[in-house]
């Protein structure tokens, strides 16, 4: 994803992986062995990256069976671009997640500087061209009353899936206009064994600046990792060994188990296949 804003270091240059960089990082032999590749921006918008389409085409032509996916706010590019993307995303499990947090009067509260009409036009164009679209909604106080309306609109527009979850971002990044929905309470701190989601699915995370990290949760703090994390990430075997006695706080918060599963497996509140 293109990283337009670095919250931790405003002087950091905007990052954009080029096709040539991706071909160097992921040669054809490596790509041929992959089951899935998807783009999701921790700090940016994947569709805004200059080479996003070319990178997806490279992965598709190199591995015709790979599953391709992308998470987006849907408010960039034009309808022709989204129609072309649908042609590239031509496998049964390919998808685009449109992160839409409400309706025209609420989506922009969290999804800053987005344009509702462009989101609708782009999503409709992608679906009409044969793409599989998923609607993902973060639930806050300001949009909690619109869940059913959003689900119905997703169905009417031809989306394949609708999902909604409560976000903790009003805690981790508190701002005055983001409040939790009614009745929400923070989950208990997990103290069980680490069940690493990334290791279980045998995945890695590559940031827009080319940094290779175990997962997107470490990627979310790529500009602010503490010295202990830097040491662990210099040797991923050391990272996994640490889970038995002193797991890093990111691993503890994300992938520690309790009697009801890990925090990752419990984060989804609503998940409904629409067609």
Residue ranges of model-derived segments:
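Radical SAM/AdoMet-radical enzyme domain recognition
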Residues: 15-41, 48-166
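Short loop/turn microsegments at loop-to-beta-strand junctions
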Residues: 199-202
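A short acidic, helix-capping loop that chelates divalent metal ions and anchors anionic groups
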Residues: 4-10, 104-110, 173-174
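Canonical Radical SAM [4Fe-4S] cluster-binding loop centered on the CxxxCxxC motif
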Residues: 1-19, 214-219
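C-terminal accessory region of radical SAM enzymes
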Residues: 122, 129-132, 157-196, 211-274
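Short cysteine/histidine-rich metal-coordination sites, predominantly Zn2+-binding motifs
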Residues: 11-21, 267-275
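Short, acidic, Ser/Thr-enriched surface-loop or helix-capping motifs
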Residues: 206-207
